Amino acid sequence: MNAHKERLESNLLELLQEALASLNDGELNSLSVTKVECSKGKHHAYVFVLSSDHKILSKLKKAEGLIRQFVLQASGWFKCPKLSFVLDNSLEKQLRLDAIFNEIAKGKGND
């Protein structure tokens, strides 16, 4: 990955966290943005949020205009990428893998 793209994703992650914190919705204020992946042309960004509630995605979609406006004002950029919000389930996957590895370790210990 090139350094410019990494820097853009890092800046966008910080700006999105600030944008969510500035909203008047308590559910959106408490969301954590875990990762941002920008497309090759940087016209589109996938924003991964930590939540177990699928309803939060519709709230984020409704607030996308305000979020993009905040990012533009705070960054001074000419354009803001289109944002697609995705629930981040990497923590759940990691916990499942840890449980599997623990079971394997217990099985080897009994042999």
From Swiss-Prot:
The keyword Kinase does not apply. Monomer. Binds 30S ribosomal subunits, but not 50S ribosomal subunits or 70S ribosomes. GO terms for biological process: maturation of SSU-rRNA. One of several proteins that assist in the late maturation steps of the functional core of the 30S ribosomal subunit. Associates with free 30S ribosomal subunits (but not with 30S subunits that are part of 70S ribosomes or polysomes). Required for efficient processing of 16S rRNA. May interact with the 5'-terminal helix region of 16S rRNA. Belongs to the RbfA family. This is Ribosome-binding factor A. It comes from the Bacteria. SUPFAM superfamilies: Ribosome-binding factor A, RbfA. Keywords: Cytoplasm, Ribosome biogenesis. It is found in: Cytoplasm. The keyword Cytoplasm applies. GO terms for cellular component: cytoplasm. Coiled coil: none annotated. Pfam families: RBFA (PF02033).
